């Protein structure tokens, strides 16, 4: 279970870095807003799911 937690945590950290770069770029480029908006919603949903998964796994690991 510990290795699953570590993989989920690494995925959350990596995806957070991607979102830190991607979200400001999406807001700064108004000509691509129509293309970026669905990606922001999907990215936010994935990030939220990863946070919940890490929280649940943390409960089982500790």
Curated annotation (Swiss-Prot):
| GO cellular component terms, semicolon-separated | photosystem II reaction center; plasma membrane-derived thylakoid membrane
Query: Where is the protein localized?
Result: Cellular thylakoid membrane
- Gene Ontology biological process terms in this record: photosynthesis; photosystem II stabilization
**SUPFAM superfamilies under this entry?**
PsbZ-like (SSF161055)
Coarsely, its chief localization is membrane
Q: Which InterPro entries match?
A: PSII_PsbZ (IPR002644), PSII_PsbZ_sf (IPR036512)
Keyword Zinc assigned to the entry: answer is no
From what superkingdom does this record's organism come? Bacteria
Query: Could you tell me the keywords of this UniProt record?
Result: Membrane, Photosynthesis, Photosystem II, Reaction center, Thylakoid, Transmembrane, Transmembrane helix
Report the transmembrane regions from the record. Answer: 8-28, 41-61
Annotated membrane topology is:
Multi-pass membrane protein
> Which Gene3D superfamilies does the record cross-reference, listed alphabetically?
Photosystem II PsbZ, reaction centre
What does the subunit comment say?
Answer: PSII is composed of 1 copy each of membrane proteins PsbA, PsbB, PsbC, PsbD, PsbE, PsbF, PsbH, PsbI, PsbJ, PsbK, PsbL, PsbM, PsbT, PsbX, PsbY, PsbZ, Psb30/Ycf12, peripheral proteins PsbO, CyanoQ (PsbQ), PsbU, PsbV and a large number of cofactors. It forms dimeric complexes.
Give the similarity note: Belongs to the PsbZ family.
Physiological role: May control the interaction of photosystem II (PSII) cores with the light-harvesting antenna, regulates electron flow through the 2 photosystem reaction centers. PSII is a light-driven water plastoquinone oxidoreductase, using light energy to abstract electrons from H(2)O, generating a proton gradient subsequently used for ATP formation.
Could you tell me what this protein is called?
A: Photosystem II reaction center protein Z
Source organism (scientific name): Gloeothece citriformis (strain PCC 7424)
Q: Which gene encodes it?
A: psbZ
């Amino acid at each position: 279970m510990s290795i699953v937690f570590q993989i989920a945590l690494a995925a959350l950290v990596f995806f957070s870095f991607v979102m830190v770069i991607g979200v400001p770029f999406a807001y700064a480029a108004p000509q691509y807003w129509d293309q970026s908006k669905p990606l922001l919603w999907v990215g936010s949903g994935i990030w939220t799911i990863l946070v919940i998964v890490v929280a649940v796994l943390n409960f089982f690991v500790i």
